[in-house]
């Protein structure tokens, strides 16, 4: 479909693969949560509010992780923060398998969320700063495509491993990235443009936070914060509840895992088409079009009743939603200069994670009060449309532009 010159460079290929695999592990952990909570709801007899609280706890940790890891990465380096966040979420995930109570499990998932929330924006900034401008968006979307690999892995683990060895096996597998961090320590380096600005690393943290709200960057910051909030709100509200919603629609737990696996496979072509279009038609085109199509498929999924209709709607939902995520991760670092790029990206992601906190808990609260599934998904339709409008009206096109220093 397209030829990417940057990936003909061995160094760039190694960077994309190294950061991508860490990204895949993150996605696997998030995906496993959606399957584990469906099993725990039955085994521990959790209420809908507890299910919502559990999935929200992870996002609360991600709020803190994204906010502070981005700023720390601007001071201490992208590589160092990437490694520490990877180790943190791996350790917390492994220990989650030993949790004997709901409260302990929630506490451990909070720390896992801190690591997850910190790793993602730092990894996208690292890759964005390391490849040529003409292919930067495409390469970052391909980085995001590893997320689909992680979700596919989580669905396979849920379908083949967890029914035999229990939900604890999912968390134990989630501890494997700790071993991968040893490899990352020698396989990646901070981007040259970051190393060249050593004198600006010790700038006070508060000044970095304020920098994203100066007159030059305020419009972009407002747009990004709206975009991130609406996308994360809708994603975590819909996808973390997918297996549970399938069960509520009358399918068995194992059958729901099978259907979600099929839907998850659609994420890969979603990323690949977004990677093609993002350098051909621009960031705004990809984000607006993919978000609006996500909104339409959300309405269809919420109202679908038959297995065929649910799977078809779920495939469209996965295809366009994850393609939009790829565009968002490519677009965000491009709107800030090197000295506070990771801070700006992290703060936008952190604000978005607030949506990830609210949505799963809100879904549980609404369902407990007999609000219908179609009505819940109309809420996500509205959220996604707001995000698309923010990009269309406030966004600045960055296709082909060099990153600001």
Regions found by a protein language model. Name each.
Residues 33-34, 216-271:
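Extracytoplasmic gate region of multi-pass secondary transporters
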Residues 64-102:
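Conserved MFS/SLC helix-loop-helix module at the cytosolic interface between two early adjacent transmembrane helices
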Residues 97-108, 163-165, 303-313:
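Helix-loop junctions at membrane interfaces in 12-TM secondary transporters
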Residues 143-186:
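Helix-loop-helix hairpin linking two adjacent transmembrane segments in secondary transporters
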